[in-house]
Design a protein with these regions (language model features):
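Well-ordered alpha-helical segments embedded in enzymatic catalytic cores
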Residues: 67-70, 124, 251
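Walker A/P-loop
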Residues: 140, 145-146, 150
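Signal for well-folded cores of large energy- and translation-related assemblies
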Residues: 57, 72-76, 90, 96, ...
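Short amphipathic alpha-helical segments
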Residues: 65-68, 96-98, 149, 199-201, ...
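Helix-rich effector regions associated with P-loop NTPase G domains
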Residues: 1-10, 16-45, 51, 80-82, ...
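Canonical P-loop GTPase G-domain recognition
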Residues: 81, 90-142
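Phosphate-binding glycine-rich loops and their immediate beta-loop-alpha structural context
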Residues: 41-50, 55-108
């Protein structure tokens, strides 16, 4: 983050550059110029963040816990406080959002159920933002811009539509924006993304970023246990006994399968 003094002609001079205390990143998208020797490079999303809000929707597009867990891994690996927003709950006829809220709250994450139609959850969400730099990150079409416009009507951000064919949103934000919304309160609006692969995560370390595993990993027979197939794995035993959510564990295995070693510069 930088501070600037504006000149009368609209130009500015940087007067201060804040030291970087943290940053959030992912593997760069699979596009030309975003790789080195065939390996995808690191793409920094934002720095000096107080907390992350993973924005999802219960429908249109459908809630995808495996994607949420990838966002969480990226956040945990950067030691950034992580929260989850499940938006569009006015479409949730079966109350599925309550099931997901329970799963993630039991682990220790704050979960906000929101609706821009009824303004459900807005008061508690607004209070959580105050006095902080808040990064909002999520798939295209989950309603980030609509949330911002409802929380802070003066923003008047562009809102996109959802494709009825593939349930994917269209990008309405094309770059990151740091927006001051109140005294000492900022939001970082990011473009909706189609894929999220955490950067710099090794197979042996992935379990550290599933915080419900921590109670059991010290009891594993092998110090290099990946909690996948090894005998004497206490994480697997905890899943089998219901102490760890099987849904979360299956998500862990899915991420484990896709991890490749990254080139670290």
């Amino acid at each position: 983050m930088v501070e600037i003094d504006l000149n009368k002609d609209g130009t500015g001079v940087i007067t201060k550059i804040s030291p970087r205390k943290n940053y959030l990143s992912r593997k760069a998208p699979k596009i030309k110029g975003a790789s080195f020797r065939g390996e995808r490079l690191e793409q920094i999303i934002a720095a000096n963040i107080d907390q992350l809000f993973i924005v999802t929707s219960i429908k249109h597009p459908e809630f995808n816990n495996k994607v949420v867990d990838r966002f969480i891994v990226a956040s945990e690996s950067s030691s950034i406080t992580c929260n989850i927003i499940i938006n569009k709950i006015d479409l949730d006829d079966t109350k599925t959002s309550l099931k997901w809220k329970a799963i993630y709250q039991d682990i220790g994450y704050k979960v906000f159920l929101t609706s821009t139609l009824s303004r459900h959850g807005f008061e508690s969400l607004s209070q959580s933002l105050k006095g902080k730099i808040n990064l909002f990150w999520g798939h295209s079409g989950v309603g980030k811009s609509s949330l911002f416009n409802s929380l802070y009507p003066s923003l008047n951000l562009k809102v996109g539509l959802i494709s009825s064919f593939n349930q994917k949103g269209k990008h309405t934000t094309v770059t990151n924006y740091l927006i001051k919304v109140e005294k000492d309160t900022y939001i970082i609006d990011t473009p909706g993304i189609r894929e999220i692969d955490p950067y710099g995560i090794h197979r042996r370390d992935l379990g550290h970023y599933f915080k419900e595993f921590s109670e059991f990993t010290s009891g594993c027979k092998f110090s290099t246990c990946t909690h996948n197939h090894e005998p004497g794995c206490m994480v697997i035993e905890a899943v089998q006994s219901g102490k760890i959510s099987e849904i979360r564990y299956n998500s862990y295995l899915r991420i484990l399968e896709t991890i490749e070693d990254d080139i670290i510069f």
